[in-house]
Amino acid sequence: MKMEDPIVIFGKWAEEGKDLGMEKGHANSVKKMLEFACKERADLGKKFSFLDVGCGNGWVVRDIGENKLCGRAVGIDGAQQMIANAESRDKKNEYIQTDIDSYTPFKRFDLIHSMEVFYYLKNPSKTIKRICDNWLNPNGRLIIGIDRYYENFQSHSWEEKVGTPMHLIKEQKWKAILEKSGFFGVKTWRVNPSKDWKGTLVITGKTK
């Protein structure tokens, strides 16, 4: 089976309106991730900047952009069609079509979020290291959600079903990647598990 670039796949999904299904399917997990991250920002009581990595149609950026403490909300995505969908729905916030593997922001962020993106990247470890070194402000937080990981056996067949390359990494390996990249206080947990579904794996850590 010939594998396609993930950007091509997601571009097609955007054109077909599947981005709305992705939004609905990920909403509960993302809500819990953002509740955790935004409570921390609220406790600090300071304005913060936000980046969504793999923003799709911009639904998370739009949501965080309404937070009274959010001074700037940005979404990046590799698929131009996704960015077009985001910009058509939102004139307030900022969207950038870019290669996530090589992107470097001109201004650092306080909170970086990503849902269902990092196992598609060519080199997740390298990108996470760059996020720690170059994307986040001191005392910034990265929070990632993924549904495809080794312990979630239902996700093992996705690469073949979707037809695009995907990493399959164990939970403790994801934690180790963040720690090796320079993040501290790294934690993992799972949200919305069910009988045959291990739930979304959340990995998060802070910069010094």
Where in this protein do the model-derived segments appear?
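Conserved class I S-adenosyl-L-methionine
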Residues: 1-42, 63, 150-151
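Class I SAM-dependent methyltransferase SAM/SAH-binding core
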Residues: 51-102
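A conserved beta-strand element that flanks and buttresses the S-adenosyl-L-methionine
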Residues: 113
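A short glycine-rich, Lys/Arg-flanked "PGG" loop and its adjoining helix->strand segment in the class I
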Residues: 125-138
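Conserved beta-strand signature within the Rossmann-like core of class I S-adenosyl-L-methionine
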Residues: 139-146
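Short, glycine-/aromatic-enriched active-site segment of Class I SAM-dependent methyltransferases
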Residues: 147-165
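Short alpha-helix
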Residues: 166-181
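Conserved S-adenosyl-L-methionine
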Residues: 183-194
